[in-house]
Amino acid sequence: METFLTHPLGPKMKERAKLDDLVVSTRIRLARNVKDTVFSPVLSKEGERQLCDRLEGRLRGLKGFEYLHMRDYDEVTRQALMEKHLISPAVAANEESAVFLSEDETISVLINEEDHLRIQTLLPGYQVKEAFELANQVDALCAESLSYAFDEQLGYLTTCPSNIGTGLRASVMLHLPGLTLTGRISPILRELRKLGYTIRGRYGEGSDAAGRLFQLSNQRTLGSHESQLLADFMEVTEQVIQAERHAREELIAHRQEELEDRFYRSYGILRYAKLLSSTEAIERLSDLHLASDLGILSDWSPPKFHELIVRLQSGFLQKHFGKTLSTQERDRERATLVRRTLDQGLV
């Protein structure tokens, strides 16, 4: 377990990747349920425990994975795993949930989430096809040991009707400061929802978009083959990316002085503040990331932006110090950590 919490990013997430100035990460999730087994929402705690033990026994053969049962870890540890996107908020909140986690942190097989099984792959930058291929391979390995709930007409049966069919959910984490600062983000979000896509904050449903970070996902999984769903998703994602590029060009062309003032104010706060909330830290770091992308500030890399965001979250921060911290203590240590990072340079 400790290997997963020593560093804020796994080895793959530290690598530079395609379009990583705008796309922080790509995630593929496959929802699966076990045949002839009551679905998760109506399972008792004892039923969840039995299912967890059963799936652990069946999937123990997965090579290169570590099995983590949530009941064995405290709330802060689970929160830190969630902050790294290795488990979902639902798994973090349930002691009878578990995860098979790959050594390189690119694959999570979640047990007792909304569905019995959720296979997740996470890669840096814009790598939709690669993430799907990886998830497909893990799905095939799991299917060797499990019989899935499947209907010839409907496809994979899932707890939520929106997941029935392929059970496929593709997501990209997008950094969209240009659209946000130009005021264009709201109409784009409305249009995306009309097209059947969801857009949320960093941790999915119910979370905010601090740092202008948005999670774009497909909503429809029924009635189309995986290849068509992915093609449609990639087309929409690339349209959003293009809109963000245009918004950034407009900002540089017409509002450069205002931008420079904003960036240096954020740098000053990060460099000298004694207390920083996680929300303010992310917002200010988002400004620095955009400044680097636009050539106004140098010595920055997209993985460093992502790494700092994880490192400054409450759970990971407390794991770093090895103790529970009050809100003010977290804000103090967060500010200290940012100052030390800037002292060492941004790269």
From Swiss-Prot:
GO terms for molecular function: ATP binding; creatine kinase activity; protein kinase activity. InterPro entries: Arg_Kinase, ATP-guanido_PTrfase, ATP-guanido_PTrfase_AS, ATP-guanido_PTrfase_cat, Gln_synth/guanido_kin_cat_dom. SUPFAM superfamilies: Glutamine synthetase/guanido kinase (SSF55931). Belongs to the ATP:guanido phosphotransferase family. HAMAP family: Prot_Arg_kinase. NCBIfam families: PRK01059.1-4. This is Protein-arginine kinase. The lineage of its organism: Bacteria, Bacillati, Bacillota, Bacilli, Bacillales.
